[in-house]
Amino acid sequence: MKVLHVCSELYPLLKTGGLADVLGALPAAQKEIGLDARILIPAYPAISAGIPDTGVVAEFHNSAAGHVVLRYGEFNGVGVYLIDAPNLYAREGNPYHDQWYNDYADNYKRFALLGWVGAELATGLDPWWMAEVVHAHDWHAGLTSAYLAYKGRPAKSVFTIHNLAYQGLFAYHHLFEIGLPTSMFNVNGLEFYGQISYLKAGLYYSDAVTAVSPTYAREITTPEFAYGFEGLLSTLHSQGKLVGILNGVDDNIWNPNTDGYIQDHYKLKSMTGKKKNKAALQAHFNLPEKPDALLFVMITRLTEQKGVDLLIQSAENIIKQGGQLALLGSGAPSLESALLGLAHKHPKNIAVKIGYDEPLSHLMVAGGDVILVPSRFEPCGLTQLYGLKYGTLPLVRQTGGLADTVVDSTAENIKERRATGFVFNEANSQALSHAISRAFSLWKKQRTWFTVRTVAMEQDFSWQISARRYEELYRRI
């Protein structure tokens, strides 16, 4: 089965979030189980630099982009089509906005071309390979399904929601420029409150829609999580067209026994390396090297969605019980300054690095005792999965993929060898603080802690499992 993934990020070449991690791993896992999976992505500078050896598949003229060349190369064993359109894509840095965080004014053209080429690869743009399933990811690729529908559905279409908060909204008058008829601009189509929504195109015109966890798939049928799409998503859910499939963990990148970013490897039967990573992490952050101090880590975008404000309000509980907190991330200036203020006030307990640092993130997952993911909503979440794999117990809010992947350390769950971390329900600082206290209580019972840690490390969230679930879906539609 020939599967084309249409996307705008690819780990490790270009990443702004978890979307890149998925595309860096899922197509390769699908190839391993026998699917012929390929990727379509704009030829951003970082992508072109990472895939330098390409051949020309097709050339054409586009009114928005001018001369366009469709190239083909390979990356990590997976075939990749690159849309070489310098007028639209030859921009360094973030693929969606400029250095001042202003969205590019021509994003409607940039991502319409991505969707159009995705549909054309199902109808012969590459005469040697024709997609049977076109799998689009997030709003950037949402128009793919609309173009396929306009062409009479020459291939099956699947659309994955990684984050419903970003909807790809553009003015109605751009409809003519993107080559779609006015008949598609209505409630049963592209229209969303008077604008074109590329996200809605993906939701409405696809044969199946997936969310990146079963719980998130249910949550987005409710007004609290649906951003105005609850009617459409509820309909899709009742028709069996909306399903949740968990993301996986790329074992080539995230594995404590082979991790290329850490010096001291370890595995379930030999955990000495974890203690060494903890000491190295404490040294890196200039925290006192205390093996007995409970060390919390958090790697995140600094936004209220991620519950960072809840942590700021609860940090006192970590300090008062003699714990330590190491945090890596960037985002809202108010949250950055509040965290830096805490670190300045409590240098023996709290350390903060503003920015993103891939090697450091691996050391933090390897060296921490608890990884914090107190999100208000979380479609899937990846850091809690890394924590499980590295024996760094996740402390999470019961939402989205966090609810599907972490089992709370209640007495009953511990006894049944099911517990893998700490879970709290309400999105407030009191609930988070109580969960932090429960982590300290368990830390005092080291034998029980080791039992929970063992169960956590035994969990299997490999991409092969996810790849098989997607294959089942492709064959069903």
Swiss-Prot record:
InterPro entries membership: Glyco_trans_1, GS/SS, Starch_synth_cat_dom
Top-rank taxon, per record: Bacteria
PANTHER family xrefs: ALPHA AMYLASE DOMAIN-CONTAINING PROTEIN, GRANULE-BOUND STARCH SYNTHASE 1, CHLOROPLASTIC/AMYLOPLASTIC
Record key words, sorted: Glycogen biosynthesis, Glycosyltransferase, Transferase
Gene Ontology biological process terms, A to Z: glycogen biosynthetic process
Gene3D superfamilies in the record: Glycogen Phosphorylase B (3.40.50.2000)
Binding-site positions, ADP-alpha-D-glucose: 15
The encoding gene: glgA
Catalytic reaction annotation: [(1->4)-alpha-D-glucosyl](n) + ADP-alpha-D-glucose = [(1->4)-alpha-D-glucosyl](n+1) + ADP + H(+)
Record keyword Glycosyltransferase present: yes
Protein name per UniProt: Glycogen synthase
HAMAP family hit by this protein: Glycogen_synth
GO molecular function, one term: alpha-1,4-glucan glucosyltransferase (ADP-glucose donor) activity
GO cellular component labels: cytosol
Function of the molecule: Synthesizes alpha-1,4-glucan chains using ADP-glucose.
Key word Transferase present: yes
Family: Belongs to the glycosyltransferase 1 family. Bacterial/plant glycogen synthase subfamily.
Record-listed E.C. numbers: 2.4.1.21
Pathways per UniProt: Glycan biosynthesis; glycogen biosynthesis
Chain coiled-coil ranges: none
